Amino acid sequence: MTQHLFMVGARGCGKTTVGQALARVLGYAFADTDDMLWRSTGKTVAEIVAKEGWTGFRARESEILTSVTQGNAVVATGGGIILSAANRRFMRARGTVVYLHATAQELSRRLRAYPEDDQRPSLTGKPMIEEIAEVLAAREKLYQEAAHHVLDASQPPDDVVSAILQQLYPSAAS
């Protein structure tokens, strides 16, 4: 049976880093919806948003999400994938959704350490910590609604992977 593990959470929470490590451990394929979007369009998230707006980007993001249907895979999603109720339903119906939760302070620290401005356009135009706190507050309920499992993403990636494995396979951990 095909099994998908969808990683959700705010930008900078570790969806790609943890997702890649988890895929290696499980022997699953790894997919990143932002990367898939770039490969299919030849444009970065910032370029798509500049040309089509957030609505156009979100529509493309949903198309990419539903195209991930073959084989066992860990899928790192964009931070806003949960804004669409259809995306939340799709992920829950097609696999297990893992919410990597981190505080605004931790996310800000990570984003400052590894800036990717061309990949991550501002959503509000506010200073980073304010924007992150505002976006988290607006999305927290949706992340929780989508998730089968919620994990603390402030730990090192290997620890987060171990915690995910313990949640997914509790009998193997004992």
From Swiss-Prot:
Please name the GO terms that the record assigns under molecular function. Answer: ATP binding; magnesium ion binding; shikimate kinase activity
A family per Pfam: SKI
- Per the UniProt entry, the Enzyme Commission number(s) are 2.7.1.71
Give the note describing cofactor binding and stoichiometry.
Binds 1 Mg(2+) ion per subunit.
Binding-site positions, Mg(2+):
T16, D32
Q: Which GO terms describe its biological process?
A: amino acid biosynthetic process; aromatic amino acid family biosynthetic process; chorismate biosynthetic process
UniProt-annotated stretches for the region LID domain: 112-126
Highest taxon in the source lineage: Bacteria
What CDD domains does the database record attribute to this sequence?
Answer: SK (cd00464)
Query: Per the similarity annotation, which family is this?
Result: Belongs to the shikimate kinase family. AroL subfamily.
Its name, as the record gives it, is Shikimate kinase 2
Q: What organism is the protein native to?
A: Sodalis glossinidius (strain morsitans)
